[in-house]
Protein backbone atom coordinates (compact mmCIF):
# COMPACT_ATOMS: atom_id res chain seq x y z
CA UNK A 1 0.00 0.00 0.00
CA UNK A 2 2.81 2.43 0.88
CA UNK A 3 4.46 1.63 -2.45
CA UNK A 4 1.54 3.32 -4.19
CA UNK A 5 2.20 6.66 -2.46
CA UNK A 6 3.78 9.14 -4.85
CA UNK A 7 3.92 12.74 -3.66
CA UNK A 8 4.50 15.43 -6.26
CA UNK A 9 6.58 18.53 -5.54
CA UNK A 10 3.38 20.58 -5.54
CA UNK A 11 1.71 18.32 -2.95
CA UNK A 12 4.72 18.40 -0.63
CA UNK A 13 4.93 22.18 -0.90
CA UNK A 14 1.22 22.43 -0.02
CA UNK A 15 1.85 20.19 3.02
CA UNK A 16 4.76 22.47 3.99
CA UNK A 17 2.77 25.71 3.80
CA UNK A 18 -0.23 24.20 5.59
CA UNK A 19 2.07 23.01 8.40
CA UNK A 20 3.60 26.50 8.52
CA UNK A 21 0.14 28.09 8.72
CA UNK A 22 -0.86 25.84 11.64
CA UNK A 23 2.42 26.64 13.37
CA UNK A 24 1.91 30.39 13.02
CA UNK A 25 -1.75 30.11 14.05
CA UNK A 26 -0.62 28.45 17.28
CA UNK A 27 2.05 31.10 17.80
CA UNK A 28 -0.48 33.93 17.57
CA UNK A 29 -3.69 32.47 18.99
CA UNK A 30 -2.84 29.69 21.47
CA UNK A 31 -1.12 29.74 24.84
CA UNK A 32 2.37 28.28 25.17
CA UNK A 33 2.54 24.94 26.94
CA UNK A 34 -0.95 23.59 26.26
CA UNK A 35 -1.64 20.44 24.23
CA UNK A 36 -3.07 22.05 21.11
CA UNK A 37 -0.22 24.56 20.99
CA UNK A 38 2.45 21.85 21.21
CA UNK A 39 0.66 19.65 18.66
CA UNK A 40 0.31 22.38 16.03
CA UNK A 41 3.87 23.60 16.50
CA UNK A 42 5.10 19.99 16.30
CA UNK A 43 3.39 19.76 12.88
CA UNK A 44 4.95 23.10 11.96
CA UNK A 45 8.46 21.63 12.27
CA UNK A 46 7.79 19.84 8.97
CA UNK A 47 8.09 23.04 6.97
CA UNK A 48 11.72 24.12 7.20
CA UNK A 49 13.30 20.73 6.35
CA UNK A 50 10.93 20.33 3.39
CA UNK A 51 11.93 23.83 2.23
CA UNK A 52 15.60 22.81 2.48
CA UNK A 53 14.89 19.63 0.55
CA UNK A 54 13.33 21.56 -2.33
CA UNK A 55 16.03 24.22 -2.15
CA UNK A 56 18.54 21.47 -2.92
CA UNK A 57 16.30 20.04 -5.65
CA UNK A 58 16.01 23.52 -7.15
CA UNK A 59 19.75 24.08 -6.93
CA UNK A 60 20.55 20.98 -8.96
CA UNK A 61 17.85 21.69 -11.54
CA UNK A 62 18.24 25.47 -11.85
CA UNK A 63 20.12 26.90 -14.82
CA UNK A 64 20.67 30.24 -13.11
CA UNK A 65 21.58 30.15 -9.42
CA UNK A 66 22.02 33.93 -9.24
CA UNK A 67 18.44 34.44 -10.43
CA UNK A 68 17.22 31.86 -7.91
CA UNK A 69 19.06 33.70 -5.13
CA UNK A 70 17.69 37.05 -6.28
CA UNK A 71 14.14 35.68 -6.22
CA UNK A 72 14.55 34.46 -2.63
CA UNK A 73 15.95 37.81 -1.50
CA UNK A 74 13.24 39.78 -3.30
CA UNK A 75 10.43 37.93 -1.52
CA UNK A 76 12.38 37.94 1.76
CA UNK A 77 12.33 41.75 1.76
CA UNK A 78 8.61 41.76 0.95
CA UNK A 79 7.89 39.34 3.81
CA UNK A 80 10.07 41.01 6.44
CA UNK A 81 7.59 43.59 7.86
CA UNK A 82 4.88 40.93 8.17
CA UNK A 83 7.30 38.53 9.86
CA UNK A 84 8.39 41.25 12.30
CA UNK A 85 4.74 41.99 13.05
CA UNK A 86 3.93 38.33 13.69
CA UNK A 87 6.78 37.31 15.98
CA UNK A 88 6.31 40.26 18.33
CA UNK A 89 2.66 41.05 17.81
CA UNK A 90 1.96 42.31 21.34
CA UNK A 91 5.34 43.90 22.03
CA UNK A 92 6.39 46.22 19.27
CA UNK A 93 5.22 48.21 16.28
CA UNK A 94 6.06 46.25 13.11
CA UNK A 95 7.05 49.54 11.48
CA UNK A 96 9.83 50.11 14.01
CA UNK A 97 12.94 49.99 11.82
CA UNK A 98 15.15 48.66 14.63
CA UNK A 99 12.98 45.59 15.06
CA UNK A 100 12.51 45.24 11.31
CA UNK A 101 16.27 44.69 11.03
CA UNK A 102 16.69 42.62 14.20
CA UNK A 103 15.68 39.13 12.99
CA UNK A 104 15.46 38.02 9.37
CA UNK A 105 12.61 35.82 8.15
CA UNK A 106 13.16 32.29 6.89
CA UNK A 107 13.52 33.35 3.25
CA UNK A 108 16.67 35.24 4.24
CA UNK A 109 17.93 32.07 5.94
CA UNK A 110 17.16 30.00 2.86
CA UNK A 111 18.94 32.58 0.70
CA UNK A 112 22.02 32.18 2.91
CA UNK A 113 21.72 28.39 2.61
CA UNK A 114 21.54 28.70 -1.18
CA UNK A 115 24.59 30.97 -1.13
CA UNK A 116 26.43 28.27 0.85
CA UNK A 117 25.53 25.73 -1.84
CA UNK A 118 26.79 28.09 -4.55
CA UNK A 119 30.10 28.53 -2.71
CA UNK A 120 30.40 24.77 -2.18
CA UNK A 121 29.99 24.20 -5.93
CA UNK A 122 32.40 26.99 -6.91
CA UNK A 123 36.05 26.69 -7.95
CA UNK A 124 37.32 28.56 -4.91
CA UNK A 125 39.99 27.00 -2.72
CA UNK A 126 38.82 24.65 0.01
CA UNK A 127 40.07 27.01 2.73
CA UNK A 128 38.20 29.97 1.25
CA UNK A 129 35.04 27.89 0.84
CA UNK A 130 35.16 26.83 4.50
CA UNK A 131 35.78 30.42 5.63
CA UNK A 132 32.90 31.81 3.58
CA UNK A 133 30.48 29.10 4.72
CA UNK A 134 31.41 29.80 8.35
CA UNK A 135 30.68 33.50 7.72
CA UNK A 136 27.32 32.60 6.16
CA UNK A 137 26.50 30.36 9.13
CA UNK A 138 27.28 33.22 11.51
CA UNK A 139 24.97 35.54 9.54
CA UNK A 140 22.23 32.88 9.66
CA UNK A 141 22.22 33.08 13.47
CA UNK A 142 20.43 36.42 13.08
CA UNK A 143 17.63 34.91 11.00
CA UNK A 144 14.70 32.57 11.61
CA UNK A 145 15.83 28.97 12.30
CA UNK A 146 19.44 30.10 12.70
CA UNK A 147 22.11 27.75 11.41
CA UNK A 148 19.74 24.80 10.83
CA UNK A 149 18.88 25.51 7.14
CA UNK A 150 22.55 25.92 6.22
CA UNK A 151 23.45 22.59 7.82
CA UNK A 152 20.44 20.75 6.39
CA UNK A 153 20.93 22.00 2.83
CA UNK A 154 24.66 21.25 2.79
CA UNK A 155 24.00 17.72 4.02
CA UNK A 156 21.17 17.07 1.56
CA UNK A 157 23.28 18.49 -1.29
CA UNK A 158 26.32 16.40 -0.35
CA UNK A 159 24.35 13.15 -0.63
CA UNK A 160 22.19 14.19 -3.58
CA UNK A 161 20.62 12.29 -5.38
CA UNK A 162 20.94 9.27 -3.04
CA UNK A 163 17.66 9.62 -1.12
CA UNK A 164 18.51 6.92 1.43
CA UNK A 165 21.86 8.51 2.26
CA UNK A 166 20.22 11.95 2.40
CA UNK A 167 17.67 10.67 4.91
CA UNK A 168 20.20 8.93 7.17
CA UNK A 169 22.55 11.93 7.19
CA UNK A 170 19.68 14.37 7.75
CA UNK A 171 18.27 12.38 10.69
CA UNK A 172 21.70 12.11 12.32
CA UNK A 173 22.20 15.87 11.94
CA UNK A 174 18.69 16.65 13.20
CA UNK A 175 19.12 14.46 16.28
CA UNK A 176 22.50 16.06 16.94
CA UNK A 177 21.00 19.54 16.73
CA UNK A 178 18.19 18.52 19.09
CA UNK A 179 20.78 17.35 21.62
CA UNK A 180 22.68 20.62 21.23
CA UNK A 181 19.42 22.53 21.76
CA UNK A 182 19.02 20.70 25.08
CA UNK A 183 22.44 22.11 26.00
CA UNK A 184 21.35 25.58 24.83
CA UNK A 185 23.77 25.47 21.87
CA UNK A 186 22.31 26.78 18.59
CA UNK A 187 19.02 26.65 20.50
CA UNK A 188 16.49 27.96 17.99
CA UNK A 189 13.94 25.59 19.54
CA UNK A 190 13.06 24.75 23.16
CA UNK A 191 14.46 21.74 24.99
CA UNK A 192 13.00 18.30 24.27
CA UNK A 193 12.91 17.74 28.01
CA UNK A 194 10.08 20.26 28.31
CA UNK A 195 8.47 20.22 24.84
CA UNK A 196 7.60 17.67 22.15
CA UNK A 197 7.49 20.37 19.46
CA UNK A 198 11.19 20.20 18.38
CA UNK A 199 10.94 16.47 17.60
CA UNK A 200 8.82 17.39 14.59
CA UNK A 201 12.01 18.00 12.58
CA UNK A 202 12.46 14.22 12.49
CA UNK A 203 9.29 13.71 10.40
CA UNK A 204 10.06 15.24 6.95
CA UNK A 205 11.91 12.15 5.58
CA UNK A 206 8.61 10.26 5.88
CA UNK A 207 7.28 12.64 3.24
CA UNK A 208 10.22 13.13 0.87
CA UNK A 209 10.78 9.36 0.81
CA UNK A 210 7.67 9.17 -1.39
CA UNK A 211 8.76 11.95 -3.75
CA UNK A 212 10.03 10.68 -7.09
CA UNK A 213 10.65 13.88 -9.00
CA UNK A 214 7.13 14.56 -10.26
CA UNK A 215 6.34 18.30 -10.32
CA UNK A 216 2.55 18.02 -10.20
CA UNK A 217 0.16 20.96 -10.56
CA UNK A 218 1.42 24.54 -10.82
CA UNK A 219 -1.62 26.28 -9.39
CA UNK A 220 -0.96 29.99 -9.04
CA UNK A 221 2.27 29.90 -11.05
CA UNK A 222 5.88 29.68 -9.89
CA UNK A 223 5.55 32.55 -7.39
CA UNK A 224 2.44 31.31 -5.53
CA UNK A 225 4.36 29.74 -2.64
CA UNK A 226 6.61 32.79 -2.29
CA UNK A 227 3.57 35.08 -2.11
CA UNK A 228 1.74 32.82 0.32
CA UNK A 229 4.42 33.38 2.96
CA UNK A 230 3.84 37.13 3.57
CA UNK A 231 0.13 36.84 2.73
CA UNK A 232 -0.68 34.27 5.41
CA UNK A 233 1.23 36.25 8.07
CA UNK A 234 -0.63 39.43 7.11
CA UNK A 235 -3.96 37.58 7.29
CA UNK A 236 -3.26 35.97 10.68
CA UNK A 237 -1.99 39.21 12.23
CA UNK A 238 -4.94 41.18 10.85
CA UNK A 239 -7.36 38.57 12.23
CA UNK A 240 -5.78 38.77 15.68
CA UNK A 241 -5.86 42.57 15.61
CA UNK A 242 -9.54 42.48 14.62
CA UNK A 243 -10.42 39.99 17.38
CA UNK A 244 -8.72 42.12 20.00
Swiss-Prot record:
Q: Which UniProt keywords apply?
A: Fimbrium biogenesis
Mind telling me which Pfam families this protein's record contains? TraX (PF05857)
Superkingdom is Bacteria
Q: What is this protein called?
A: Probable fimbrial assembly protein FimC, serogroup D
| Organism (species) | Dichelobacter nodosus (Bacteroides nodosus)
Q: Which gene encodes it?
A: fimC
Amino acid sequence: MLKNIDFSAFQLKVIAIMAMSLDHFALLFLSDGIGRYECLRFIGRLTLPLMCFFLVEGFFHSRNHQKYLGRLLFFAFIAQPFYSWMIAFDQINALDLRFFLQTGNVLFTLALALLALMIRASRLSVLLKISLIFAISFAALYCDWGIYPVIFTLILAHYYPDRKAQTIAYLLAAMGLLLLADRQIFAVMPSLVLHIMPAGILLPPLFWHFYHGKKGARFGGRYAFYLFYPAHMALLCSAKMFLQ
